[in-house]
Design a protein with these regions (language model features):
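DUTPase catalytic domain/fold
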Residues: 1-165
Length: 165
């Protein structure tokens, strides 16, 4: 049974990890109110400019509640300072996945990016989700129809009067 928690209570007791590598570090929050848990590299790596690399964390999920997912996201400092980010962000970790957590990092910077064993490379957030039941029904007609990207307008108007016209 999942216990109720608030934003100040860590949820690590409802998520269990197992080491796949001797040089692993368990995910940890940098501050008490940090939403994400930092993930660490287990090896020294280099990502060339405009390249990507799958980086191991040395941990795998042993247990996670069925109504929770992990989302692997970029660390803002790496993206801002070096142009290095999680390519498929957020990378979804389903509650039944049992392989090693790996991070797909891309280097959009102009210089090679060096990763040392133990460096913080990404963060993981644990988020509850719901799975809806889908019913087959006819689609109602709406004014918008199948119009998509940009169909409701782009840009901005200069005045409120122009907007209301």
């Amino acid at each position: 049974m999942l216990r109720k928690y608030d934003r100040y209570t860590p949820i690590d007791d409802s998520v269990e990890f197992e080491a796949t590598d001797d040089s692993f570090s368990f995910p940890m929050r940098a501050t008490k109110l940090a939403a994400g848990y930092d993930l660490f590299s287990t090896k020294d790596e280099v990502i060339r400019p405009l390249d990507r690399k799958l980086i191991g964390t040395g941990i795998k999920l042993k247990k996670m509640p069925e109504d929770m997912q992990g989302e692997i996201r970029s660390r803002s400092g790496l993206a801002n300072k070096y142009g290095v980010f999680v390519l498929n962000s957020p990378g979804t970790i389903d509650p039944d996945y049992r392989g090693e957590l790996k991070v797909l990092l891309a280097n959009m910077g102009h210089l090679p990016f060096d990763i040392s064993r133990g460096d913080r490379i990404a963060q993981i957030l644990f988020i509850k989700y719901e799975t809806p039941t889908f019913n087959h029904k006819s689609i109602s007609h709406y004014e918008r129809g199948e119009k998509g990207f940009g169909s409701t307008g782009i840009g901005h108007t200069e005045t409120l009067e122009e907007y209301n016209e």
